[in-house]
A protein has these predicted regions:
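Hydrophobic beta-strand-centered segment that forms part of the acyl-chain substrate-binding groove
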Residues: 58-62, 72-113
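Catalytic strand-loop segment that frames the active site of acyl-thioester-processing enzymes
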Residues: 2-65
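Generic structural detector for well-ordered beta-strands
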Residues: 23, 27-29, 99, 150-152
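Predominant activation on well-ordered alpha-helical scaffold segments within soluble catalytic domains
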Residues: 36-39, 71-75
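A solvent-exposed, acidic/Ser-Thr-rich amphipathic alpha-helical stretch
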Residues: 66-70
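A generic structural signal for short beta-strands and their flanking turns/coil linkers
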Residues: 24-26, 34, 87-96, 110, ...
């Protein structure tokens, strides 16, 4: 499988984007099948995620995506963002903050907006990025989540 990739740019050009939005991902569908598959992986079978009939009685009125499902979608969304020329691999280094602001109802579309907050050299051949990320829900004013995401890139 070939993963989609965003623009590749020289490191100096990427570093010049600190404090700026580097991109917005495409929309991703949140289907009941996606939610059920995630529930199977995590063993989180709470009815608000997997039981459409019972979820109608919840404050959400329907099933909702797991917060961690929404967060995990960042792995797909980041592939659409610009990358640094010469990077051989990148790894998720964790999060400083994550807030689940709004529920993501089944049938919604979500996308991520990425702002490069910082980039620093850890050692020769390794940099750390900090992205301020907002996952938006199509048609909603409040985001699904906001996070400070750390990544390591290796040259």
């Amino acid at each position: 499988m070939t993963l989609p990739s965003g623009k590749v740019m020289p490191r100096t050009e990427f570093e010049a984007m600190v404090g700026k939005e580097i991109g917005v991902s495409s929309w991703f569908d949140i289907t009941q099948d996606r939610i059920d598959t995630f529930a199977g992986c995590t063993k989180d079978w709470q009815f608000i995620h997997v039981d459409p009939e019972k979820a109608k009685q919840s404050p959400f009125g329907t099933t909702i995506a797991h917060g961690f499902l929404t967060l995990s979608m960042l792995s797909a969304m980041i592939y659409e963002m610009p990358s640094i020329e010469g990077v051989k691999m990148g790894v998720n280094y964790g999060f400083n903050k994550v807030r689940f602001v709004s529920p993501v109802r089944v049938g919604s579309k979500i996308r991520a907006r990425f702002v490069l907050a910082s980039i620093e050299e850890i050692r020769p051949g390794e940099v750390q990025t900090l992205m301020n990320v907002t996952i938006e829900i199509e048609g909603e004013t409040k985001p699904a989540l906001v996070a400070e995401w750390l990544g390591r890139r290796y040259f």
